[in-house]
């Protein structure tokens, strides 16, 4: 059984995909970039962009019946590995006691020239 997830509290997909999908008791998010729910890009520094990404992730996780506490894996894409520590600083505010598995990779470019994109896999409550 699969179910697409959509919430107006996170930006709409900018391509032919859903904000996330539930398969059985697992939620797989699409990558979130620092767009506001209205679709405007947050053009601040890496910390501001990362906070917006987490706001978007929170919205899709909640819509799926999951939360940061049920995330089992996160994948972080950053445009510049020199900003790894700053991303980690913000990331740790959302995963302070619960620490899911994670990968972090530097990429040549992200959609809309974002500095960071994060996707998660979580258990649905």
Curated annotation (Swiss-Prot):
It catalyses: 2-iminobutanoate + H2O = 2-oxobutanoate + NH4(+); 2-iminopropanoate + H2O = pyruvate + NH4(+). One of its GO terms (biological process) is response to toxic substance. Its EC number is 3.5.99.10. It is found in: Cytoplasm. One of its GO terms (cellular component) is cytosol. The record marks 117 as: Important for catalytic activity at high pH. Substrate binds at residue 102. It comes from the Bacteria. InterPro entries: RidA (IPR006056), RidA_CS (IPR019897), RutC-like_sf (IPR035959), YjgF/YER057c/UK114 (IPR006175). GO terms for molecular function: 2-iminobutanoate deaminase activity; 2-iminopropanoate deaminase activity; deaminase activity. Pathway: Amino-acid biosynthesis; L-isoleucine biosynthesis; 2-oxobutanoate from L-threonine. The record marks 17 as: Stabilizes the substrate. Keywords: Amino-acid biosynthesis, Branched-chain amino acid biosynthesis, Cytoplasm, Detoxification, Hydrolase, Isoleucine biosynthesis. It is an enzyme of class 3 (hydrolase). The keyword Hydrolase applies. PANTHER family: 2-IMINOBUTANOATE/2-IMINOPROPANOATE DEAMINASE RIDA (PTHR11803), 2-IMINOBUTANOATE_2-IMINOPROPANOATE DEAMINASE (PTHR11803:SF39). Accelerates the release of ammonia from reactive enamine/imine intermediates of the PLP-dependent threonine dehydratase (IlvA) in the low water environment of the cell. It catalyzes the deamination of enamine/imine intermediates to yield 2-ketobutyrate and ammonia. It is required for the detoxification of reactive intermediates of IlvA due to their highly nucleophilic abilities. Involved in the isoleucine biosynthesis. Belongs to the RutC family. Homotrimer. This is 2-iminobutanoate/2-iminopropanoate deaminase. It comes from Bacillus subtilis (strain 168). The gene is ridA.
């Amino acid at each position: 059984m699969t179910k697409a997830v959509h919430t107006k509290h996170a930006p709409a997909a900018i391509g032919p995909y859903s904000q996330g999908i539930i398969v059985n008791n697992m939620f797989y998010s699409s990558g979130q970039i620092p767009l506001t729910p209205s679709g405007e890009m947050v053009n601040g520094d890496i910390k501001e962009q990362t906070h917006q990404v987490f706001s978007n992730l929170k919205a899709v996780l909640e819509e799926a019946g999951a939360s940061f506490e049920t995330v089992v894996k996160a994948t972080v894409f950053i445009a510049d590995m020199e900003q790894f520590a700053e991303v980690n600083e913000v990331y740790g505010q959302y995963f302070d006691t619960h620490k899911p598995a994670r990968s972090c990779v530097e990429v040549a470019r992200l959609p809309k020239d974002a500095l960071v994109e994060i996707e998660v896999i979580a258990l649905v409550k």
